[in-house]
Amino acid sequence: TIPMLNGRTICLRNIDIKKIFELIDKYNVTHFGGAPIVLNMITGAPESDRKKLKHKVYVLTAGAPPPSIIFKKMKSLGFEVMHVYGLTETYGHVTQCAWNDSWDELEEEKQNEIKARQGVRYPNTEGVTIMNPESMKEVPKDGKTIGEIMIRGNVVMKGYFKDKDATDKAMRGGWFHTGDLAVMHPDGYVKIQDRSKDIIISGGENISSIEIENTLAKHPSVSIAAVVAKQDEKWGEVPCAFIEAVKDKPVTGK
């Protein structure tokens, strides 16, 4: 609303990396939003499609948990990325990974790992917490114990249209159940581990597909990675990765 009233909002019908850089340059764009896949397309675009930025451009990214390496790649091009989190059912973003100045002293890799967190709630949201969905009790803030992200406040929908069963299931216990599995760090920052339907259970252990994807994305020859569960006779499920390699980068069997 603010840029529409006091500045300029540019909407793109298609993802065209060359056009994005041209518009940023032409209209002195200061902020833009895009899902992690769009940021990956920007960092992976040929140099001929990119323009050197005349000023820092601030980016909000949402729609999927971003791999930590994307923050480093975007920064090298002149972009400063902040991760935000929300759902259609919450009328948009309810958390942001607000930066603490004390983190400036950390090594770059650690900074990027923090930037990949979903963060803390916005002031207009009554509550964002991590609970055991069965007991409806908050999990320890240890950065390890996995629970489900629960949200409460007047930004949460009233329910699903003409679907009382789905509404009752999503709103049980007075909180909106997101279906996103996460941990909460001691500082209150939320970090998604997986969607509840995507978690890989191998030999009785929960394995986060997002964590594996994040690790794979750090390899210089990997453009993007997706990890899913594969049925296994011994372990029940094992991780299976699909990789899109960076063009002109060497890839070996290992």
Model-derived regions: residue spans:
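Active-site glycine-centered loops adjacent to acidic/histidine catalytic or metal-binding residues
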Residues: 63, 86, 119, 180, ...
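Active-site loops of AMP-binding adenylate-forming
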Residues: 47, 87-116, 124-127, 131-135, ...
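Conserved beta-loop-beta connector loops within the AMP-binding
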Residues: 121, 127-150, 186-187, 249-253
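Glycine-centered tight turns that cap/initiate beta-strands
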Residues: 55, 124, 221-224
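Conserved AMP-binding/adenylation subdomain of ANL enzymes
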Residues: 1-30, 45
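Short Gly/Pro-enriched turn/cap motifs at secondary-structure boundaries
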Residues: 112-122, 140, 170-174
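Short gly/Ser/Thr-rich phosphate-binding loop of adenylate-forming enzymes
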Residues: 58-80, 90-93, 97-98, 123-124
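AMP-binding/adenylate-forming catalytic core of the ANL superfamily
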Residues: 24, 32, 153, 158-159, ...
